[in-house]
């Protein structure tokens, strides 16, 4: 059975609204009752071709809590450095008995090269494409607070052009009934979207302030200067004055890693409205739910 005949999680578009809500409720159930399935007969390989702390480690912890045998693929010591293709690497893992892959890669839609694989893939982030499990943990965190998405006003603020998080979250949130606006400097805007606002124009109206990391590694050198950082924080960062204009029950989110003093004042990272570290905690529970879903749907 080829890849696209399997149930994968490559894009948030792979899930219906019902499936998204079921995953949220299952993740909350695992969080509250510690009742995850146990499967010690399956092997999962984690292939991270880009740096990661939260996504990679939460997948590893989630896999261990499910009893899965977690394999850490070391790019630096693999045959990738001898010129082996991504397909050949993944096909090798399939042939030696790996049952599932979690992949992060700098290439957008890298999975299109893997259509002849016969094991399912969970996308851990594809360049500036999508990040479906980050999206799901964000949705879980919002749902825990508001119990619904319908009519919520959400601002996604920052490096829209380079953000896979922005793209996945916009798709899912609008599909679920939320009203999403973008806030960004002109050079960080993505022409795919047209619903841009000024931060100060909507700061007192939004329920969710979703900040994005300025992805310095994807930018030109002038975007890394202290002058740029100061201007960015002044115009598009969550400063204390802006924070004080938020609605009483609003929440502040960030997929992390956080550039303190750039996207958000360092004193606000663990403020009352911030759920940044809760997002990280929820990520492990959501990834358990996703792993369960992939196992069940593919009869592994």
Swiss-Prot record:
Instruction: Tell me the residue numbers annotated for binding L-aspartate.
Output: 82, 164, 213
Keywords assigned by UniProt, alphabetized: Pyrimidine biosynthesis, Transferase
Taken from the record, one Pfam family name reads OTCace
Pathway membership, UniProt: Pyrimidine metabolism; UMP biosynthesis via de novo pathway; (S)-dihydroorotate from bicarbonate: step 2/3
One annotated GO molecular function? aspartate carbamoyltransferase activity
Which residues does the annotation say bind carbamoyl phosphate? 54-55, 104, 131, 134, 256-257
For the biological process aspect of GO, one term held by this record is:
'de novo' pyrimidine nucleobase biosynthetic process
| Record-listed E.C. numbers | 2.1.3.2
Query: Looking at the UniProt record for this protein, which Gene Ontology cellular component terms does it annotate, in alphabetical order?
Result: cytosol
Quickly give the catalysed reaction. Answer: carbamoyl phosphate + L-aspartate = N-carbamoyl-L-aspartate + phosphate + H(+)
Q: Which InterPro entries match?
A: Asp/Orn_carbamoyltranf_P-bd, Asp/Orn_carbamoylTrfase, Asp/Orn_carbamoylTrfase_sf, Asp_carbamoyltransf, Asp_carbamoyltransf_Asp/Orn-bd
Q: How does it assemble?
A: Heterododecamer (2C3:3R2) of six catalytic PyrB chains organized as two trimers (C3), and six regulatory PyrI chains organized as three dimers (R2).
Q: Which family does it belong to?
A: Belongs to the aspartate/ornithine carbamoyltransferase superfamily. ATCase family.
What does it do? Answer: Catalyzes the condensation of carbamoyl phosphate and aspartate to form carbamoyl aspartate and inorganic phosphate, the committed step in the de novo pyrimidine nucleotide biosynthesis pathway.
User: Under which name does UniProt file this protein?
Assistant: Aspartate carbamoyltransferase catalytic subunit
- Write the gene name: pyrB
């Amino acid at each position: 059975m080829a890849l696209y005949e399997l149930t994968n999680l490559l894009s948030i578009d792979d899930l219906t609204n019902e499936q998204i809500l079921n995953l949220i409720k299952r993740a909350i159930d695992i969080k509250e009752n510690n009742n995850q399935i146990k499967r010690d007969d399956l092997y999962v390989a984690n292939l991270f071709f880009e740096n990661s702390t939260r996504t990679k480690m939460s997948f590893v912890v989630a896999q261990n809590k499910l009893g899965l045998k977690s394999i850490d693929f070391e790019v630096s010591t693999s045959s990738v450095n001898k010129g082996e293709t991504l397909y050949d690497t993944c096909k090798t893992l399939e042939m030696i008995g790996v049952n599932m892959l979690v992949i992060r890669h700098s290439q957008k839609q890298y999975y299109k090269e893997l259509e002849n694989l016969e094991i399912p893939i969970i996308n851990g982030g594809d360049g500036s494409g999508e990040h479906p499990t980050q999206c799901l943990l964000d949705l879980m965190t919002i749902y825990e607070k508001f119990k619904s998405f319908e009519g919520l006003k959400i601002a996604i603020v920052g490096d829209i052009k380079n953000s896979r998080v922005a793209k996945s979250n916009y798709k899912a949130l609008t599909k679920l009934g939320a009203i999403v606006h973008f806030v960004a400097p002109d050079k960080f805007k993505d022409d795919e979207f047209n619903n841009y606002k000024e931060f100060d124009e909507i700061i007192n109206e939004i329920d969710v302030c979703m900040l994005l990391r300025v992805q310095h590694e994807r930018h030109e050198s002038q975007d890394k200067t202290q002058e740029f950082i100061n201007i960015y924080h002044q115009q598009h960062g969550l400063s204390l004055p802006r924070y004080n204009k938020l609605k009483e029950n609003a929440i502040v989110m960030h997929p992390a890693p956080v550039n303190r003093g750039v996207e958000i004042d360092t004193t606000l990272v663990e403020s009352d409205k911030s759920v940044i570290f809760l997002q990280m905690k929820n990520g492990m529970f959501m990834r358990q739910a996703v792993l369960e879903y992939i196992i069940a749907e593919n009869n592994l």
